[in-house]
Design a protein with these regions (language model features):
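Juxtamembrane intracellular "pre-TM" segments in multi-pass secondary transporters
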Residues: 2-13, 198-235, 346-349, 466-476
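Residue-level signature of mid-helix packing/kink "hotspots" within the transmembrane helices
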Residues: 35, 63-71, 121, 155-156, ...
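Extracytoplasmic gate region of multi-pass secondary transporters
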Residues: 37-38, 229-283, 287-288, 374, ...
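Helix-breaking motifs and short loop linkers at transmembrane-helix boundaries and internal kinks
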Residues: 49, 81, 102-108, 119, ...
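Conserved MFS/SLC helix-loop-helix module at the cytosolic interface between two early adjacent transmembrane helices
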Residues: 68-106
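Structural signature of the two symmetry-related core transmembrane helices
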Residues: 84-98, 304-321
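Cytoplasmic helix-loop-helix junction between adjacent transmembrane helices
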Residues: 112-152
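Helix-loop-helix hairpin linking two adjacent transmembrane segments in secondary transporters
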Residues: 147-196
Length: 479
């Protein structure tokens, strides 16, 4: 083999660690970009003289377009140089986010958010394909939990920064997120590019010998992806699950409205509601535990990951319902104060106000249970697909997710607006959110079906990779 000479540290343990850190940071930043505007609905709608429902429609459109573009990004990532695609995609969303910060009208903001959406799809599908090549099947759930956690923390951080910096100027947090995205995109150029199937046990001899894994997707292979039954169930579950997950993007607004209903001004309500929404999402940290449990169950049975996901999804529903309707009676904070003053006051309320504590513990339980979904879904997509198919299948799953999330996002806002005729805020938002939790029920059914089909699909993938290790060029014996 010939090629450009690399320094001795290239591809070493430290370089791989730095690569993963940079890569995970990029994943968190793109989710911060998605989460920022929903946390600033009140100041954005006031500044641009538009309605909360209009902001909801725009947010849903961004989610849907990002999901649509993720299919194309994923397909081309499975065919070509993934590093170039990730770099270009990151610069696109960073540019769109930066220009969004200077929008003076709703139309301008909508236009630049469409540009943002076009770039966000790259991190979703191409990023998944890359990270799956750094992870062995034995520890996929645990490793993917960190990937999913980074995305979740990015959303929390983006929402927190937006609610605090954006209460007075919605452009400030958008500029910050955009500049960080562009900076880490440049750092990504110096990271290690893992070959496809880098951690697959069946391909270790191939990679150790310096042989390339030559297989790439083409259009003719796409029908075969749908003939793999587990793929169908994994894609279908995303549509229903994301109706419910998409509605949850309005939880910060629900709590901002709860604070406003106590008589606080918009700026204080935005900051306090944003702080509470960030604190109440700590249950997502349990995804690490859920991923490890999924790995352990998968070693016992090839149905293990799907079973863990089904139990988590269905078990979370009653906790979400309580969480939405818990009032914030007796919450006392300093009106007009800065974040530095409000944060300790909110934390104090967690231990002294029973209503606030009830909201915290029910959200903790709900999010801890649903945290089983993300890492085990990621791991299952990798388990039942060949390395050159994973970005495309993830893109298709992400499209299904995006359709469901966009619909859940927009319809929850519309439903809450309709309920407001009879129910004052925040009760209209609580009812709207509660209605959409019913979509977790078909999600549980899809995972139950995947538990039956995944063992056969996993064995098929393992057999193909073993043949390809022996006959790298064709995957089949000569003759």
């Amino acid at each position: 083999m010939t090629g450009r000479r690399r320094p001795t540290w290239w591809g070493g343990r430290i370089h791989l660690t730095v690569t993963i850190v940079v890569f995970v940071t990029l994943a968190s930043l793109d989710n911060a970009a998605i989460a920022a505007i929903p946390q600033m609905v009140l100041p954005v709608s006031a500044a641009l003289h538009t309605s909360e429902t209009a902001i909801g429609v725009m947010t849903a459109t961004v989610i849907l377009l990002a999901a649509l573009t993720a299919v194309a990004w994923g397909y081309w990532g499975d065919r070509s140089d993934r590093k170039r695609l990730l770099f270009g995609g990151t610069l696109v969303w960073a540019l769109g986010t930066f220009l969004s910060a200077g929008a003076g009208t709703y139309r301008e903001l909508f236009t630049w958010q469409i540009v943002t959406a076009a770039g966000l799809g790259a991190i979703a599908s191409v990023g998944f394909s890359v990270i799956s090549d750094f992870v062995s099947p034995r520890h996929r759930g645990l490793a993917m939990s960190f990937w999913g956690l980074a995305e979740g923390l990015g959303a929390v951080a983006g929402g927190l920064v937006a609610s605090q910096l954006g209460a007075d100027d919605f452009g400030a947090p958008l500029r910050l997120i955009a500049l960080l995205g562009a900076g880490f995109a440049v750092l990504y150029l110096f990271t290690f590019s893992a070959p496809r199937g880098f951690r697959e046990p069946a391909l270790q001899r191939l990679h150790q010998a310096g042989e390339p894994y030559p297989h790439r997707i083409d259009v003719a292979q796409i029908p075969a992806l749908f003939r793999r039954r587990t793929n169908l169930w994994l894609i279908a579950q995303g549509l229903s699950a994301q109706f419910a997950y998409g509605s949850l993007i309005w939880v910060p607004l629900l709590y901002q409205e709860k604070v406003a209903a106590l008589g606080y001004d918009v700026e204080t309500a935005t900051r306090v509601g944003g702080l509470m929404a960030a604190i109440l999402r700590l249950g997502g940290l349990f995804s690490i535990v859920a991923g490890a449990i999924g790995d352990r169950m998968q070693r016992r049975s090839l149905s293990g990951r799907a079973v863990v996901s089904a139990v988590g999804i269905l078990g979370a529903v009653p906790f979400f319902l309580v969480f939405f309707f818990v009032p914030l009676r007796g919450l006392e904070v300093t009106s007009g104060a800065s974040t530095a003053t409000l944060l300790p006051e909110v934390l104090h309320a967690l231990v002294t106000n029973g209503w606030v504590a009830a909201a915290f513990f029910t959200s903790l339980a709900a999010l801890a249970l649903t945290s089983a979904d993300s890492p085990n879904w990621f791991a299952l997509v990798s388990d039942v697909n060949l390395p050159e198919h994973r970005g495309t299948v993830f893109g298709l799953g992400n499209l299904s997710n995006g359709v469901g999330r966009a619909a859940g996002n927009a319809l929850t806002a519309a439903a809450a607006g309709g309920f407001e005729r009879a129910l004052p805020p925040p009760l209209n938002w609580a009812v709207g959110l509660a209605v959409f939790q019913v979509f977790f029920l078909p999600t549980g059914y899809c995972y139950a079906r995947a538990a039956r089909t995944s063992p056969g699909d996993i064995r098929e993938v393992e057999a193909i990779l073993q043949r390809r290790a022996k006959y790298p060029r064709s995957g089949d014996p000569p003759g």
